[in-house]
Amino acid sequence: FDHMKILGDNLTQIAREKAGIIKENGNVVLYPQSEEVEKVIEDAAAQTSSRLFKADFASIKLKSFGIDGQIFDYSTFTDLKIKLLGRHQLKNAAVAIAACQVLKEKMQGITDETIRKGIAKARWKGRMELVCKEPIFFIDGAHNEDGVKVMVDTLEEYFPQNRKIFIMGVLKDKEYSKMVKTVARIAYKFYTVTPVSERALPAKELADVIKMYCDNVIICDKIVEGIERAAEEAEENDVICAFGS
């Protein structure tokens, strides 16, 4: 629901705006959505005489995962490897593969092997990006409730027994209270920072909100202070994640 002032305030309106990019006689590759959203996309594809392809999430089979990546099967592919972490990235990979399979019809050089290699080489800066292993330190661009839920789910799955430490900074126009409530459920400690922006929420104000859910909060004057203190004060097996906007 980001950018609601521009796209609309409900899923149907947002989908209709997004569907505006569909061109006549084109190809549409869809990440499976709710029934109401898919109806909008299907109608737009029909109106523009475009072919619609939908990734088949039911054919995804996760085989192994760890901080260095994941191995999974999808459709006719076996033992695909990706560096991106989290089950949601398997779905993103499935959509990318579906798009490549459509492009194979028009572009020479795209083969199952090049798709396999491309998926393995894919990187996404700031999306559960591992920047250090000692201590384990991630940065994630989660800046809304949905993004934070995905981040929390990933951390819980990968590190069920580890203490989780968060460095958080947000803009004051974000729904940060909802974000805090979601993260606090798994948090051992927070370091709050003030983003470099005129719209930034001061670290102290963010800390006041966090204290409603977690007593272990440290206010930092600068972002670099939050990073340094979190890294220095982390104990063995602690996991640090910096997120926000």
Q: What residue ranges belong to the model's regions?
A:
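Acidic, Mg2+-coordinating active-site environments of NTP-dependent enzymes
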Residues: 1-76, 93, 97-116
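Nucleotide phosphate-binding/pyrophosphate-handling subdomain across enzymes
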Residues: 2-3, 10-13, 76-189
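Generic structural signal for well-ordered alpha-helical scaffold segments
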Residues: 19, 101, 152-156, 227-232
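Short, surface-exposed connector motifs at secondary-structure boundaries
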Residues: 19-28, 158-164, 186-189, 235-236
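C-terminal helical cap/extension that packs against the catalytic core
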Residues: 31-53, 68-71, 136-137, 145, ...
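Beta-strand->loop->alpha-helix junctions that form or flank phosphate-binding loops
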Residues: 31-32, 44-66, 83-87, 114-121, ...
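Acidic, glycine-rich flexible loop segments
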Residues: 242
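Active-site-proximal loop/hinge segments that shape catalytic or ion-binding/gating pockets
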Residues: 245
